[in-house]
C-alpha cells in the first residue's frame, strides 16, 4: 500500500511517526510525507525511510496559500497513487482530507492529536471547531489520541461516535520502551550533563519537557518550585524546551527562569537525545491545561520517574492516580504539596516509577499501537 501522511512542520515527524514508518516499510508499505519546507526533512527521510514533498502547510489560515496547498497535495496524491492518506493536526488534517476526498482516496484518516480550541474563546474558538468538523466530515475514519479526546469530541459534536476510534489505550505512535529505559540510560552522558548544569549528588530535580508557555502550566510550575525551594535548597527545576512568543509567559516568570540559580533552562534539545535529560529527573511535572495525549508523561514513566499532572483532557489518561503519580489542580499550592510529598518519600518515588514503567510496557509500547494501526489499514 502507498500511505501518505500530511503534517505542517517537520519537528513533529519523530514524535507522530518516527520508527512506525520503518516498521510499515518492512511490512511492504511505501511511506510518503507532505510537510512544509525544512532542512530536517532530508535527514528524517533517510532515518525513517520515506519519500517526501515540500508543500507549505501553514498553521494560520491563509485562503490563497491553503488552496494552493490543497491543489499541490491533490496532485501528489495522484502522482504516488495513494491508497491511504492521513492528515495530522486540524490544519494539516483539513488540507489532507479535502485533497484526498477530491482524489477519491478510499481510506482517509484524520488523526486528532488534541482539541486546540479548548483554551480559545469567541470567534477563534468557533472557527477552530468548524475546521475540525469539516476535516472530520471529509474523513472515512478519525483517530483520537486518547479516550478523553474521544469523549470530548462527541460532547462537542465534532463527528459521529461510530466514525472515531482510539488506538489501543491511546497515543498516535506509542513509546520506545528500549530507548526510554532507566537500565539502558547512558551513564557517561548523564554524568556529563550533571557537570554541565551543576547538578550535585543529593539534588532533587523537578523536570519538565516541552514548550515553555502558559498552556503547559509553566507559571504554576515555576511558582510552586519557588515555594519548595525556600524549604529545600537542594531542589532544582529543569525546563527542557524553548520559550515561545505564542502564548508567551509573563515577563516576571521569564525573568525568574533566566535568573534563578536553581533553575536549569536548557533551551531546545534534539528529541534524539531527550532520554538523557529524563535520566537526571527525580519527578516529572506536566501541569498542562490541555493535551491530546502527553507522550512526555509516558516517556518519563518508562524511565521510572513518578509523574505529577492535571486532570486536563489527555493528561487524565496518562497516569494512574496514586500508583504511577498524582493528579493536581491548576494551582501552585496543590502542586507544591504534591512535590513535597514526593520529596519526603524516596520509597514512594521508587514504587511509582516502577509501576509507571510497567504501565507503559503493558499498554503503550510501540508495537501495541502499531498493530492497532495495521488493523485499521
Regions found by a protein language model. Name each.
Residues 14-19, 204, 208-227:
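A conserved mid-protein helix/loop that constitutes part of the nucleotide-sugar donor-binding site
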Residues 39-42, 139-179:
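A short, active-site helix/loop in glycosyltransferases that binds the activated sugar's phosphate group
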Residues 77, 268-269, 276-281:
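Short alpha-helical donor nucleotide-sugar binding micro-motif in glycosyltransferases
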Residues 250-269:
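Nucleotide-activated donor-binding/catalytic signature segment of Leloir-type glycosyltransferases, i.e.
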Residues 289:
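Aromatic "clamp/platform" in nucleotide-sugar-dependent glycosyltransferases that forms part
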Residues 306-309:
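Short hydrophobic beta-strand element within catalytic cores of glycosyltransferases
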Amino acid at each position: 500500500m502507498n500511505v501518505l501522511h500530511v503534517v505542517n512542520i517537520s519537528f513533529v515527524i519523530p514524535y507522530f511517526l518516527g520508527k512506525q514508518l520503518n516498521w510499515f516499510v518492512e511490512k511492504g508499505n511505501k511511506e510518503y510525507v507532505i510537510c512544509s519546507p525544512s532542512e530536517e526533512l532530508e535527514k528524517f527521510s533517510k532515518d525513517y525511510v520515506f519519500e517526501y514533498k515540500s508543500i507549505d502547510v501553514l498553521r494560520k489560515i491563509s485562503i490563497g496559500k491553503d488552496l494552493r496547498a490543497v491543489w499541490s497535495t491533490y496532485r501528489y496524491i495522484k502522482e504516488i497513487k495513494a491508497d491511504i492518506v492521513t492528515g495530522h493536526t486540524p490544519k494539516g488534517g483539513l488540507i489532507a482530507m479535502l485533497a484526498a476526498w477530491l482524489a477519491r482516496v478510499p481510506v482517509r484518516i484524520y488523526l486528532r492529536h488534541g482539541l486546540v480550541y479548548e483554551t480559545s474563546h469567541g470567534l477563534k474558538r468557533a472557527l477552530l471547531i468548524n475546521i475540525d468538523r469539516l476535516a472530520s466530515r471529509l474523513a472515512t475514519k478519525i483517530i483520537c489520541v486518547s479516550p478523553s479526546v474521544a469523549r470530548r469530541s462527541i460532547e462537542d459534536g465534532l463527528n459521529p461516535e461510530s466514525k472515531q476510534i482510539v488506538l489501543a489505550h491511546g497515543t498516535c505512535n506509542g513509546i520506545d520502551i528500549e530507548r526510554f529505559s532507566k537500565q539502558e540510560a547512558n551513564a557517561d552522558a548523564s554524568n556529563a550533563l550533571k557537570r554541565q548544569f551543576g547538578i550535585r549528588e543529593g539534588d532533587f530535580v523537578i523536570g519538565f519537557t516541552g514548550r515553555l508557555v502558559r498552556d503547559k502550566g509553566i507559571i504554576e510550575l515555576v511558582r510552586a518550585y519557588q515555594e519548595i525551594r525556600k524549604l529545600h535548597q537542594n531542589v532544582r527545576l529543569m525546563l527542557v524546551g524553548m520559550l515561545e512568543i505564542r502564548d508567551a509567559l509573563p515577563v516576571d516568570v521569564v525573568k525568574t527562569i533566566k535568573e534563578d540559580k536553581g533553575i536549569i533552562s536548557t533551551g531546545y534539545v534534539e528529541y534524539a537525545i531527550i532520554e538523557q535529560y529524563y535520566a537526571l529527573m527525580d519527578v516529572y511535572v506536566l501541569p498542562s491545561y490541555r493535551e491530546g495525549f502527553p507522550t512526555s508523561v509516558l516517556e518519563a514513566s518508562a524511565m521510572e520517574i513518578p509523574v505529577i499532572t492535571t486532570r486536563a483532557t489527555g493528561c487524565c489518561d496518562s497516569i494512574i492516580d496514586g500508583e504511577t503519580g498524582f493528579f493536581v489542580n491548576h494551582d501552585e499550592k496543590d502542586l507544591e504539596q504534591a512535590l513535597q510529598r514526593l520529596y519526603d518519600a524516596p520509597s514512594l518515588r521508587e514504587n511509582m516509577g516502577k509501576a509507571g514503567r510497567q504501565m507503559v510496557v503493558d499498554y503503550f509500547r510501540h508495537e501495541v499501537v502499531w498493530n492497532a494501526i495495521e488493523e485499521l489499514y
